[in-house]
Amino acid sequence: VDDGARNIAEALEMARQAVAAGTDTMVATPHRGWFLGRPARPQAVREHVAGLQESLNRARIPLKVVPGVEIKMAPRVADDLVNGEAGTLGDAGCWALIEPPFDRIPTGGIESLRKVVEAGFHIVLAHPERCAEVQQSLTFLEACAELGLAFQLTSGSLLGRFGPRALETAHAILARADDWPLVIASDTHDLHDRSCALLREARDAAALLVGAERAQEMVDARPRAMITPL
């Protein structure tokens, strides 16, 4: 479907790996970027996830997969969410996972996020620590926090897989854990370089900075709440 498992056999092996690492629920979040030709329409994602879940059940793999989408930051995101053209995490209708660019925040970026919030959705911003502008200054994230956004750190960033700047920025964001809602994502793409097994390592790395209880909350209770209908 996107840039994850290449076939069902690999998907099943990734699921086994996730279960072995202690995961019981995963959110499938294919990218949505209308300008990239990646619509990831909710119904299509639901159908693919349902098919995967059937395969997991047949293989007796105790993993629940729920639909989601990673939405490219753009002016039309609020309208797409309201119109049902873009999905939410867990198909719960509450939280939208929105991805900023890896270089600069676009002009009007904060306003596009404000419109999403005003439309009644919560936002979790995906991997902000990998954005070059955020690596230079947390000013944009401070503005996002004022809107009530949560921030999702990528496991690989906390383990230095995306370079020292991403690691340093992830640490700077973790330092705001008293004030900012944070979650940690596996960002699972494959069986090796970006595997689900990294999530436990990332949690342990975060625990060195924020404590074990809070780090566990970032990989369990808080993301679980995001996929639960209000």
Regions picked out by a protein language model, each given a short descriptive name:
Residues T29-H31, W180-C196:
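Short acidic/histidine-rich active-site segments
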Residues P30, V65, H127, D187, ...:
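Divalent metal-coordination and catalytic microenvironments
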Residues E54-L63, D179, L208-E213:
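Short helix-capping segments at alpha-helix termini
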